[in-house]
Amino acid sequence: MEITDLLWSDSGEPVVRAEAVALLRSRGQSRAARTVSLLPERDGFLDADATDALGLRIHRELQRLGEELQLGRRVASVVRTLLPAGDEPVRVVDVGCGLGHVLRSIAAREELPPCVELVGVDLNTVLVSEAARLAASEGLDCRFVSGDAFEPGVIIDDGARTVVVSSGLMHHLAPEELDGFFAAQARLGVAAFAHWDIAPCLWSTMGAWIFHQARMREAVSRHDGVMSARRAHPAETLLAAAGRGAPDYAIEVREGSRWHPKALDVLRPLVGVRR
């Protein structure tokens, strides 16, 4: 379990610090439990302002990984091959966008045709607000909204003219949740999806530890970076879940060699195209 999974509750209610610490200890994550026990609290709850500030620092550090892995360029390269034909507007939706680094990078380089609208969606309102502020300050043609991207009417209005992407999201889902993740996109009838996540292997785990020790300063970032690599789903699990959840899509995981991997391949995409 990653510490960031516990910093905010789905309901928006304050998080009881002692409960978060106890949960981590029950899972044998004593180091993570100690890290959480040192976070600021008010009346037994994690201090909301301090937690939000920590979340922003963590995601700013996470952008370093996106820059190193050239995610903006790589996502744009794949999305260009998935865009529906015709000159009508197409919407590219980044689910779990965080600070919107991927879309902001694409917008800054104008790597997709003018008919493409870039929209980032995240459940965390603090991250969405900061993503919107950054886009505005950088003068970028992309926007960010808070909510569940797969709820009808939130952001996907015309599935046939929509491509859904994400980066580093799927490992936050339990194996039993993956079917529903893909099924939600199929129900909306999206033209295609491309979800980047960690390819689990010895090299990715070792690389995550080295990178986060060298480039990250927050204890939470260092812990969660390695945990992300350890909990990532193998290609077989993703393919099976996508096949069950989105049977009308042609699915593939574009994965390099595990024994002679390229550094950029540590995050590889699962791509689905509606038949």
Predicted stretch roles:
Residues 189-199:
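Conserved beta-strand signature within the Rossmann-like core of class I S-adenosyl-L-methionine
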